[in-house]
Amino acid sequence: MWLTFALAICLGVVVLYVPGYLVGRAVSLERFASVAAAPAFSVVALVILGVILNAAHVRCDGWMLLLACAALCLLIYGACRVLRGLRGVDGRTHLTRNAVDSEWILVALYVGVAAAVSLVVFVHAMGDPVSFSRNDDTTVHLSVVRGFLDSGTFSTLNVTKYLDLGESGGYYPAAWHVVTAVVASLVGNQVALATNAMILVVCVFVLPVGLLFLLRQLFPDNKLALYAGSLFSVAFCGYPWGFVVFGQLLSNLLSFALIPGALGLLISSLNASGPSKSGFAVAYACNMISVALAQPNGAFTLGIWSVAFAVSHLWSKRSDGYWSGKRTAIILCFIACAAWVLLFVAPPLQGVVTYSWKSTLSIPKAIVAGLLFMFTNREGVQPFLTVLVLLGIAKTLKDRRLRWLSVSYITAFSFYVIDVATDGFVKQLLTGFWYTDYYRTGAMTVLFAIPLAALGFAWLVKLGTGLLGKMRFGRQGSNNSCVVAMVLVVLLAVC
């Protein structure tokens, strides 16, 4: 059974990365960017094909949907290569051998650390590959996947728990379920096993690799922060593990995991030039769609992060024309706020934005709980992460280019406090897109805290190295940094 589970994990990686990688290369992304964007491309292709086949009254097995997806992505890759050849455009990105080697070393580090943590936190507690949580949301997830498999239809426009019994369904953000059904079809339709495998694929591969791609854009000259980032992709209880022990919120798990890579693509698109610039823009748009297909509130989470970065980028941009950077940034803020209000009053979303969870904490307690990353009673206090995030915020105050990271985090933190400690119109307006669910707004806060934690860890290592060098009569070097880093890793593990 464990060998089948390992096979399911490998198949999950293939399903998410192989088809999408071809599309990434087709739109002129360099290899690592194509890997980071691959899950989003694959998700969009699988969901669209599922809808089209169902509309055409074509029933198929999950592995057949995967073959169709691979064929479509291969066709896109071939067509783009031919078009570039006819136009005489070289869409390749040339990197030095050292840069390429460094990228894949970091990928191995991020995936390795996430795998080690996941083995301890998830696999050890799981007990058996076919175990499953007996929560209400989990039974729905398993039933939807089973319905896809038994009915031979994979349309997110026709989702119900009883699809295999002929019941007509409706729209549901079921990207997670489509992907899981495809994986399950390759391992004997074992739904629970495929679900557990996909949880690991998201936590060990999708989230860490996307985070690495984002941090490479944020900290291009801070190697220590890049290496430190490997410690934090799955270090917080609030996300991803909060979504695994509560609900389970598996659609949100995938949606949020796609967000770091998507933001990295936006940053790359604004900094790139040549054919890759449009490629990054296409990849970002596709990532936004995939995030929404997995769970729409993820699109709002990505929107907050994206607008914060875009405003910061425009504000610092020098221009003498009428459309100066600052003027454009202000207009973008107004457009974002107007779009928020329009979506809040949109009839299709009323069932979501009017749903309300009652407040459970006072405002002071909510602030303390949020600072300690104990967003609910199912999660633990993590004081060392608090220190690192606060140090990261302090560091951004010294770097105007990164201040938007702190603004985003404070915004998400405020949403969580309002969500868990108040009731009324303001709560619905600000957090209604997340069902006023403080598990989800808390997870958003965690997501925005991860880069700050990496930045704070790197800064603390530098401070500790300097202090240790002075204590050792001025001798400084890489050994001091290693000692300090090891001490901090131990503190992270126990605190």
What residue ranges belong to the model's regions?
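Membrane-embedded, hydrophobic transmembrane alpha-helices
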Residues: 1-107
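Hydrophobic, aromatic-rich transmembrane alpha-helices
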Residues: 310-311, 383-406
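Membrane-interface transmembrane helices that cradle and orient dolichyl/undecaprenyl
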Residues: 259-280
